[in-house]
């Protein structure tokens, strides 16, 4: 999978980890740090007030984006969000320090997929989801959850490259992880993906041959239990990068990330009959990986850059204008509070 300079943090981390796993031995035994404890003391929390390139909304359907409050966002890097339809369960990728090279992130004991739940309007302390056997290396991310099945990408021992895996939620935890097969991983070259609510269509990005640009969005239909040869979603692709697709549960909207004026931005295409409409810009300026809850609230990752260098990443939300503004106001309050902290 080709990785562009502006691609999300997670994938660049995974790709370098691939080169390391083939020669890695068992990691040295050490005390596993906490997520917050792994954030370096000199990490300064970025805030909307200090952001040189804040995300900008281009649609009157959404309010101005705000960062999710602590304990979801920290002075580390929160990336690759996935929100469930009820809006109360959030999955995301975390690494404590974007300055640390991937070969060290692989061994830090905290980089990986996390989950946070919202109760009474407040997000819980995120917990890491372990998707590998004890003593074996893996760097997991780009999670997608449907029911009791999680799809995720991983660079791990015993496999070459970044591959898709699945896991099952049973007895209160994720288990029974399996390689998703050569058809998806090798033949179709599936990257980050989203499956329609009826399970019949798999949308994904890939640099596979036959596309319009660098990364393109493709769709594969399931027939007789098998994923068919992918088709290019031509109406949304361009010579630029298009990827990180999200399909609304009604199947009527395709959300994705595209390079716009040199930075990742969020676009939407609507289903009209059997075709996807010309994409419209929704959020620009280092915004990507859109994911929506059932009320139409838009969650995404925002990367903070200063002097051309990435400093941090946070999960943001742009509330739909039809939604209650109470939690929106709480998020703004937390954002104001966080500017006084150099480290959470």
State where each predicted segment sits.
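C-terminal motif of bacterial Sec signal peptides marking the signal peptidase cleavage site
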Residues: 21-23
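Bacterial N-terminal signal peptides that target proteins for export
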Residues: 2-11
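Short, conserved micro-motifs composed of acidic
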Residues: 28-344
């Amino acid at each position: 999978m080709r990785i562009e300079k502006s691609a999300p943090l997670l994938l660049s981390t995974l790709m370098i980890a691939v080169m390391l796993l083939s020669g890695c031995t068992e990691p040295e035994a050490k005390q596993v740090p906490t997520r917050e404890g792994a954030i370096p003391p000199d990490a300064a929390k970025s805030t909307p007030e200090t952001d040189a390139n804040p995300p900008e909304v281009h649609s009157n359907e959404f309010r101005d984006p705000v960062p999710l409050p602590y304990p979801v966002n920290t002075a580390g890097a929160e990336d690759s969000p996935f929100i469930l339809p009820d809006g109360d369960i959030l999955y995301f990728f975390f690494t404590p320090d974007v300055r640390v090279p991937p070969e060290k992130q692989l061994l830090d004991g905290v980089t990986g997929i996390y989950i946070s739940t919202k109760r009474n309007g407040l997000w819980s302390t995120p917990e890491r989801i372990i998707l590998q056997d004890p003593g074996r290396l893996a760097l997991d991310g780009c999670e997608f959850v449907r029911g009791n099945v999680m799809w995720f990408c991983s660079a791990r021992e015993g496999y070459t490259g970044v591959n898709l895996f699945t896991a099952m939620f049973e007895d209160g935890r994720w288990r029974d992880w399996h390689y998703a097969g050569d058809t998806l991983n090798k033949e179709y070259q599936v990257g980050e993906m989203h499956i329609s609510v009826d399970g019949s269509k798999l949308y994904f990005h890939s640099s596979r041959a036959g596309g319009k640009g660098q990364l393109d969005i493709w769709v594969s239909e399931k027939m007789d239990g098998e994923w068919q040869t992918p088709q290019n979603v031509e109406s949304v692709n361009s010579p630029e990068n298009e990827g990180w697709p999200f399909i609304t549960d009604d199947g009527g909207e395709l959300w994705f990330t595209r390079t716009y004026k040199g930075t990742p931005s969020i676009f939407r295409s609507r289903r009209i009959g059997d075709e996807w409409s010309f994409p419209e810009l929704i959020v620009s300026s280092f915004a990507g990986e859109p994911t929506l809850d059932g009320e139409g609230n838009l969650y995404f990752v925002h990367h903070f850059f200063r002097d051309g260098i990435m400093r941090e990443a946070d999960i943001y939300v742009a509330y739909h204008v039809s939604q209650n503004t109470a939690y929106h106001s709480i998020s703004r309050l937390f954002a104001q509070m966080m500017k006084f902290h150099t480290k959470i």
